[in-house]
């Protein structure tokens, strides 16, 4: 059983956490501001540079949402202080990525280039065959990285495509020729 929800979250210097009506939490920091509405049954307290999340009872739903809420608040605090970055790697001959303003243009072996405009709050940078997706909202950064990866998932036979940096692709054996 996880006990993540019981751990208090430390608030670093320069970060301000406010809990509004109906558990609407706003976190302000040097990189920006994030807000999210959490389950109103949970009790979120901000006391002396710490955030504590308490649940009203021990039902399985409350136990699950307790740990999730604590993790989401911790990610909001980390996002406004450090930010999040996901790196993608392009593997394959003729596969390239270029920046066109804020948008990214991908050439992935299709008959046409793919233009992708990132949502508000997410930045994309291209360095050679590496695409860096960064921002303060962990969910948005991960979603954009997954969307870019979906344009050309790694091929199971040769490994060509877009993959997360460090992702290991298990390659399948090709057809064996009979005698």
UniProtKB/Swiss-Prot annotation:
UniProt cross-references to InterPro entries, sorted A to Z: Ribosomal_uL6-like, Ribosomal_uL6-like_a/b-dom_sf, Ribosomal_uL6_a/b-dom, Ribosomal_uL6_bac-type, Ribosomal_uL6_CS
Keywords annotated in UniProt: Ribonucleoprotein, Ribosomal protein, RNA-binding, rRNA-binding
A cellular component term, taken from the record's GO annotations: cytosolic large ribosomal subunit
Highest taxon in the source lineage: Bacteria
One annotated GO biological process: cytoplasmic translation
Keyword Methyltransferase: no
Recorded GO MF terms: rRNA binding; structural constituent of ribosome
Subunit and partners: Part of the 50S ribosomal subunit.
NCBIfam families: L6_bact
HAMAP family membership: Ribosomal_uL6_B
Role noted for this protein: This protein binds to the 23S rRNA, and is important in its secondary structure. It is located near the subunit interface in the base of the L7/L12 stalk, and near the tRNA binding site of the peptidyltransferase center.
Name of the featured protein: Large ribosomal subunit protein uL6
The organism of origin for this protein: Persephonella marina (strain DSM 14350 / EX-H1)
Taxonomic lineage of the native organism: Bacteria, Pseudomonadati, Aquificota, Aquificia, Aquificales
Gene name of this polypeptide: rplF
């Amino acid at each position: 059983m996880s006990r993540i929800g019981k751990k208090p979250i430390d608030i670093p210097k320069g970060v301000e956490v406010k809990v509004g009506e109906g558990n609407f939490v706003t976190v302000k920091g040097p990189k920006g501001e994030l807000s999210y509405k959490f389950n109103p049954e949970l009790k979120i307290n901000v006391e002396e540079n710490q955030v504590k999340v308490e649940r009203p009872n021990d039902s399985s739903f409350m136990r699950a949402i307790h740990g999730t809420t604590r993790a989401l608040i911790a990610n909001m605090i980390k996002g406004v202080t450090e930010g999040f970055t996901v790196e993608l790697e392009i593997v394959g001959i003729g596969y390239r990525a270029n920046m066109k303003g804020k948008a990214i243009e991908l050439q992935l072996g299709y008959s046409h280039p793919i233009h992708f405009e990132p949502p508000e709050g997410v930045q994309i940078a291209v360095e050679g065959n590496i695409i860096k997706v960064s921002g303060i909202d962990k969910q948005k950064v991960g979603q954009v990285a997954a969307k870019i990866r979906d344009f050309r998932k790694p091929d199971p036979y040769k490994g060509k495509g877009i993959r997360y940096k460090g992702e290991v692709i298990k390659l399948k054996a090709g057809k064996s020729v009979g005698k």
